Regions:
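Generic ordered-secondary-structure signal
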Residues: 1, 11-12, 21, 29, ...
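Metal-dependent polysaccharide deacetylase catalytic core of the NodB/CE4 family, i.e.
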Residues: 1-58, 81-91
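Repeat-unit-sized solenoid/scaffold elements
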Residues: 37-51, 78-80, 155-173
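A structural signal for short secondary-structure junctions
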Residues: 42, 64, 79, 125-127, ...
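Generic alpha-helical secondary structure signal
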Residues: 54-56, 64, 186
Length: 192
């Protein structure tokens, strides 16, 4: 009876890193998992959660070509301007599974982000990468003041406002090899 309350979506066959893989490997990981979901669970919803939240241009465009909605591993709310090939998802496991944080998560509003640059966050060479965030509207001076970012394991990054609609976020220290995260927040007066 609980099965009616649960959907299981595609997360690949082997949950391996999908960066720099051949088309053959990528298609096998995505399509074989989808066929198994359809065969064993009679579910054929085309949602794909990138393993480890990682993808490159090739993986992104294959997800697009085959009509999937993609999920990264970054936290955030989904809005009308969200990239439906790289949607955010909130973690609800282990230390992130507290009910108080769940209430906060389901009441979170999307930030008015139009896009981010670079689109594909595979970094090589520049160990203090700059992230440009372009907003879908002008932010008030108070919103810009309250806009805050964090970098995994570091002090707060440098924020350089280009204008009221664009900001550059840059780590103060080199990022370690492996996965790192830039996380930005901004309070809202709206109710979530």
């Amino acid at each position: 009876e609980m099965a009616e309350l649960v959907d299981v979506y595609n997360h690949s066959v082997t949950h391996q890193h999908l960066i720099d893989k051949t088309d053959e490997v990528l298609l096998n990981e995505i399509i074989s998992a989808q066929l198994r979901l359809k065969s064993e669970l009679s579910q054929d919803n085309k949602f794909f959660a990138y393993p480890y939240g990682e993808f490159d241009g090739k993986t992104y465009h294959l997800i697009e070509k085959y009509g999937y909605i993609g999920f990264g591993q970054h936290s955030g709310a989904i809005g009308s301007m969200s990239d439906f090939l790289n949607l955010p998802r909130f973690a609800m496991a282990s230390s992130y599974a507290e009910m108080d944080s769940f209430v906060t998560k389901i009441n979170t509003l999307p930030m008015p982000v139009k896009n981010e640059e670079p689109k594909f966050m595979i970094i090589s060479g520049n160990n203090k990468p700059a992230l440009r965030i372009n907003f879908s509207r002008s932010l008030t001076s108070n919103e810009r003041y309250q806009f805050t970012c964090f970098v995994s394991g570091q002090e707060m990054p440098d924020l350089t406002w280009l204008n009221s609609e664009s900001v550059i976020v840059q780590a103060k220290e080199s990022l370690p090899q492996g996965r790192s995260r830039y996380n930005c927040t901004m309070p809202s007066k709206e109710k979530g």
